[in-house]
């Protein structure tokens, strides 16, 4: 046919031009020195790693001129198309006339060219051929071509039998059963609800407030597609309160001191009213019977006797008061010590004009100064004795002079 041959030649010419234009990006025979700065492709080393080849030809143009080939030629073309992957790995070497005229084949209508599942169309064709085998030869339209094309009256009146071409079962061709740790999908029905995430609550009944609520989301890829899948997604719908405790964390343990006090107070509340014998310093034999947890050691018993008139709240208040008193006394002691060091520094002659003298230096200088003071004290004591003796001599001489 002149129209088909002209279109096929144009397609082949366009493919060869595209092949020549991008061939130096993928092969080693291109001179990089000549076209180094003109090329916008990545470095050649990257393409060597992937070993890329030219892309396959585009979808064949459906020219509606002429009539389709005979069923025998169509079957031969389909077998050649299916066996091509095992023989070749490069460009598709198909006859352009057969490719353009074979519009009634189900292979050309598969998901690679028309974006829908080929297995569904094959099932449809097989079911229609089994039910309408007598009427299929008289129909003027192919079953695999959309019905909104008005110019398909001159096409072939019969489709290729998929059972004669495809040997694998049609019902399970494109359906897979995917199952992971938290995902399960089956092909029993299109409207089946698939539980994607399953959360098992192993916590107490008091934590059911923080439970995760499943949300059903309907996803529809095509508005005209009757298939619909529902997914259960577990969403944690709790507000983020960063001050609150985590729902998965266990309650914090109280300090051991408070535990002991609680164990001591609980038997005391459950026991009978106290008797005056409890005031004695020695533990009575009734005390261990009333509080078995405290009877382990005598120290616990004495502690129990001392802590009876106070509750945990009052004991906490007493601890706070003791801590405050201790801090006040410690602060006062430090202030007194600092003031005394300053007074000692002022007494040393060499450190009066040194306000930032360390305490060690103050103590060393004070020791040396104290030793000098002791030496001077001894000297002055000796001088005092000498002066007293001299005074005694002078008084005796004066008395002798008066007698004379």
UniProtKB/Swiss-Prot annotation:
The segment annotated Disordered runs over 175-195, 238-331
Residue ranges of the bHLH domain?
321-373
Q: Where is this region: Leucine-zipper?
A: 373-401
Extract the coiled-coil ranges from the record: none
**Entry-linked Pfam families:** HLH (PF00010), Myc_N (PF01056)
Keywords (alphabetical) are: DNA-binding, Nucleus
GO cellular-component terms in the record? nucleus
Q: Which GO terms describe its biological process?
A: regulation of transcription by RNA polymerase II
Q: What is its main location?
A: nucleus
Q: Which PROSITE patterns match?
A: BHLH
Key word 4Fe-4S present: no
Q: Where is the composition biased (Polar residues)?
A: 287-315
* Any GO molecular function: protein dimerization activity
Q: Where is it located?
A: Nucleus
Concerning InterPro entries, the annotation shows: bHLH_dom, HLH_DNA-bd_sf, Myc_transcription_factors, Tscrpt_reg_Myc, Tscrpt_reg_Myc_N
- Quaternary organization: Efficient DNA binding requires dimerization with another bHLH protein. Binds DNA as a heterodimer with max.
The name of this protein is Protein L-Myc-1b
């Amino acid at each position: 046919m002149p129209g088909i041959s002209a279109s096929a030649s144009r397609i082949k010419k366009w493919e060869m031009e595209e092949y020549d234009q991008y061939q130096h990006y993928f092969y080693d025979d291109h001179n990089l020195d000549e076209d180094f700065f003109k090329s916008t492709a990545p470095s050649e080393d990257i393409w060597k790693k992937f070993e890329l080849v030219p892309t396959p030809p585009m979808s064949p143009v459906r020219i509606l001129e002429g009539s389709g080939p005979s069923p025998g030629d169509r079957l031969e073309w389909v077998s050649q198309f299916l066996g091509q992957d095992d023989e070749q790995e490069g460009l598709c070497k198909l006859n352009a006339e057969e490719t353009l005229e074979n519009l009634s084949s189900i292979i050309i209508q598969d998901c690679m060219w028309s974006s829908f599942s080929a297995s569904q169309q094959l099932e449809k064709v097989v079911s229609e051929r089994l039910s309408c085998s007598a009427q299929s030869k008289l129909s003027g339209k192919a079953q695999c071509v959309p019905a909104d094309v008005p110019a398909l009256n001159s096409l072939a009146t019969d489709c290729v039998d998929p059972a004669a071409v495809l040997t694998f079962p049609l019902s399970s061709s494109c359906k897979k059963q995917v199952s992971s740790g938290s995902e399960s999908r089956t092909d029993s029905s299109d409207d089946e609800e698939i539980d994607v995430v399953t959360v098992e609550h192993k916590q107490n009944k008091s934590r059911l407030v923080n439970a995760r609520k499943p949300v059903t989301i309907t996803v529809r890829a095509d508005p005209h597609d009757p298939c619909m899948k529902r997914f259960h997604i577990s969403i944690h719908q709790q507000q983020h309160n960063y001050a609150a405790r985590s729902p998965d964390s266990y309650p914090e343990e109280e300090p051991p001191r408070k535990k002991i006090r609680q164990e001591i107070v609980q038997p005391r509340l459950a026991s009978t009213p106290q008797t005056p014998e409890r005031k004695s310093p020695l533990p009575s034999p009734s005390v261990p019977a009333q509080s078995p947890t405290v009877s382990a050691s005598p120290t616990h018993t004495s502690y129990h006797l001392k802590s009876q008139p106070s509750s945990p709240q009052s004991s906490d208040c007493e601890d706070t008061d003791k801590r405050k008193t201790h801090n006040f006394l410690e602060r006062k002691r430090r202030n007194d010590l600092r003031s005394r060091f300053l007074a000692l520094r002022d007494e040393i002659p060499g450190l009066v004009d040194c306000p930032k003298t360390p305490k060690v230096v103050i103590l060393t200088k004070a020791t040396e100064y104290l030793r000098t003071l002791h030496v001077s004290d001894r000297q002055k004591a000796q001088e005092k004795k000498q002066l007293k003796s001299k005074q005694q001599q002078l008084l005796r001489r004066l008395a002798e002079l008066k007698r004379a």
